[in-house]
Amino acid sequence: MQSWSRVYCSLAKRGHFNRISHGLQGLSAVPLRTYADQPIDADVTVIGSGPGGYVAAIKAAQLGFKTVCIEKNETLGGTCLNVGCIPSKALLNNSHYYHMAHGKDFASRGIEMSEVRLNLDKMMEQKSTAVKALTGGIAHLFKQNKVVHVNGYGKITGKNQVTATKADGGTQVIDTKNILIATGSEVTPFPGITIDEDTIVSSTGALSLKKVPEKMVVIGAGVIGVELGSVWQRLGADVTAVEFLGHVGGVGIDMEISKNFQRILQKQGFKFKLNTKVTGATKKSDGKIDVSIEAASGGKAEVITCDVLLVCIGRRPFTKNLGLEELGIELDPRGRIPVNTRFQTKIPNIYAIGDVVAGPMLAHKAEDEGIICVEGMAGGAVHIDYNCVPSVIYTHPEVAWVGKSEEQLKEEGIEYKVGKFPFAANSRAKTNADTDGMVKILGQKSTDRVLGAHILGPGAGEMVNEAALALEYGASCEDIARVCHAHPTLSEAFREANLAASFGKSINF
């Protein structure tokens, strides 16, 4: 086998490097292009460049592994950076600003405006600028850490080989000691409803609508459904979410928090039909869509007509054409790749992380798995406590939680105590005129140890990380209550809730 540097120099002389601009202040990524008869030697080959894949690739290179990352799309970053977490947060943030300016909020603060207009094209442009900068940033980090980026569809063609098929049909073979599958997930289709990303859209299409629909129906009131539904509701659409379950916010949310969350969203104008199932959708000649619904338990049918139907019933692992069957790697009943605690499949040098394995489909969970998986390859310890992985819904107000909910503790028969503190009693929330919501802490009755934290309110997505740290290190409610928190800050509500849990009473409520 040729050495890495020899292959690199040989190709450079032959002119097989293609400098591709990635929009980050003139920097360039340098993917490696070779002929199929010149395989690349690698220690670690990562398939997929989403949050799990790109982080794992960088960490592997930092640990001294010769690393290749294969990505089928033109840009790095996977679903999260391109059509998921990042663009949705841009629209969530900007639609919140528009909602404040367009409603009575600004006037109540003494900010008077004669006219507020929505420039949707400009809003989409700002979203795209953020995405371009961040995806380009990964390309720069790959270059900086000497990760080789191969653009193509990766397939495992042997236990020590991956073949990437490029858009032009050419192939690139990578001979590798270790393979890490980080191919993420895809939208779960709704039976009988065809997504065209025009008027019947997935989360991808909902991020790029050309105009604000008059009426939108969202199938699913989980995290993605309420986030994207709230974007278009704030921008002026009449939005109704149809949810099979009896609550909003998806799996894991505390029911008390969910009820309060639903109340706040409804006050903003978001409509919900809970315990209701969608039985079909028909596109009419005028372009509108008739959505057929009925009670989840069965009953009288009803039709809701809308301009845009958003399908948000979840995501499923993306494992198409990876070559798993040929290797004898079978998927579990939910389409996930079975792995052990070191993220190894049944073939020890083939690993899998992120959305293709068990656990919540969260970008930060995939990042953690990517780092510790690669550290394990290098002989390090592998540890992740999924109970300490936080979840966030980025609406306004935000919802965030980590650890156990009240419902889970009851189901597990664990005796617990509760501490609550409303943002209405928090001085910073008062000065911001943003007081909806509360902090709820669950502590073990016998030991005072923090078991769960549930936050509904401004800055919840930032505050929950203090709770995750407390859970990871086994802190008690008293530990947090005795830590001095700056005043006036929203995080004081977190301290006060822990005071209530540990001592039975907070100070300011």
UniProtKB/Swiss-Prot annotation:
Cofactor note: Binds 1 FAD per subunit.
Tree of life domain: Eukaryota
Effect of residue 466 to A: Decreases dehydrogenase activity. Loss of proteolytic activity
Residues found modified as Phosphoserine: 285, 297, 502
Pfam families linked to this entry: Pyr_redox_2 (PF07992), Pyr_redox_dim (PF02852)
Cell inner membrane found in the keyword field: no
Disulfide topology: 80-85
Complex and partners: Homodimer. Part of the multimeric pyruvate dehydrogenase complex that contains multiple copies of pyruvate dehydrogenase (subunits PDHA (PDHA1 or PDHA2) and PDHB, E1), dihydrolipoamide acetyltransferase (DLAT, E2) and lipoamide dehydrogenase (DLD, E3). These subunits are bound to an inner core composed of about 48 DLAT and 12 PDHX molecules (by non covalent bonds). The 2-oxoglutarate dehydrogenase complex is composed of OGDH (2-oxoglutarate dehydrogenase; E1), DLST (dihydrolipoamide succinyltransferase; E2), DLD (dihydrolipoamide dehydrogenase; E3) and the assembly factor KGD4.
Role: Lipoamide dehydrogenase is a component of the glycine cleavage system as well as an E3 component of three alpha-ketoacid dehydrogenase complexes (pyruvate-, alpha-ketoglutarate-, and branched-chain amino acid-dehydrogenase complex). The 2-oxoglutarate dehydrogenase complex is mainly active in the mitochondrion. A fraction of the 2-oxoglutarate dehydrogenase complex also localizes in the nucleus and is required for lysine succinylation of histones: associates with KAT2A on chromatin and provides succinyl-CoA to histone succinyltransferase KAT2A.
Name recorded for this polypeptide: Dihydrolipoyl dehydrogenase, mitochondrial
Annotated source species: Homo sapiens (Human)
